[in-house]
Amino acid sequence: MEVPRVGHSISSPTSPCEDMMKNLSLDAIQLCEREGNKSLDSGIAEMEELPVPQNIKISNITCDSFKICWDMDSRSKERITHYFIDLNKKENKNANKFKHKDVPTKLVAKAVPLPMTVRGHWFLSPRTEYTVAVQTASKQGDGDYAVSEWSEINEFCTADYSTVHLTQLMEKAEVIAGRMLRFSVFYRNQHKEYFDHAREAQNNKMLPSVKDNSGSHGSPISGKLEGIFFSCNTEFNTGKPPQDSPYGRYRYQLPAEALFSPKTNLYFGDFYCMYTAYHYVILVIAPQGSPGDDFCKQRLPALDIANNRFMTCSEDEDGQLVFHHAQDLILEVIYTDPVDLSLGTVAEISGHQLMSLSTVNAKKDPSCKTCNISVGR
């Protein structure tokens, strides 16, 4: 069953009961406090003979949908006309609150064969823990409902964006990518102590670390993928990296071919903004066959390294590798393997450390029409 916005008709191509559900509708009902396991909704009478849902099972969980089914005693089963589904974010213990203006946490569905699909990006977010409980109900002639007791409360967590969702994000990013500019180096800014530690304690290597939670909440790489962040953007008038950086006054710089070549795979990771005009795309470079490559193959859209709208590596007429990046996006490039400092150089930048431009744990603007898709943010 697909859960619509209040007052909208619905259809559910993903439901196994599609034909039976074309005329289903959901309405908001008054939210209620619970005392014990009873419903105290005003205007709703309790009838003990209505069966209480038992053994609730939740399956087919995506970033903005799930299937739900349960067992019921056959007693008075034929009297059931509706199901009440009480859905709440786990951290919100008060069922008498709205998640968002005009969006109820309690859903009313016409009784249909189970399992049914609950879908709705306006009340389901990716990577979020929820609690769910169910009542059976019988609509009376006067419009009131007779209801069963509440089922036990069950918990589940929604999933990350799938490759289908990421492909939708990627297509939106392609629209604003702009023309391609040539570049020749990757660079990474940090504090002096970071590079000193790499030399002294890490055998002269920068080591991958787990990506933070910046960007889209549903991105499958946040908090999971290990890598090292690099930049490749250049100033259009000089063709060189900018002298300012939000991440530190010391910059490690190395030839682009040291990280990006036909021996690596390239993946699209995310597209987001931080309440500003700047838009960011996260790309992942993974040496072929590496653990990072295996991780990305299962979760991210792969890009043709020689032909995409974000960052390319191709051969010129002389067989030399040439590199280009999109002008109108800020690219954040994650390299999934350790990098030896001997492959490049460290030097202090002459510009400013612009802390306001840092994307560390930055939250995506959920209202931006340019970089959001119609699933959980």
UniProtKB/Swiss-Prot annotation:
It comes from the Eukaryota. One of its GO terms (cellular component) is cytoplasm. Residues 52-161 form the Fibronectin type-III domain. InterPro entries: FN3_dom (IPR003961), FN3_sf (IPR036116), Ig-like_fold (IPR013783), PHYHIP/PHYHIPL (IPR042868), PHYIP/PHIPL_C (IPR045545). May play a role in the development of the central system. Belongs to the PHYHIP family. This is Phytanoyl-CoA hydroxylase-interacting protein-like.
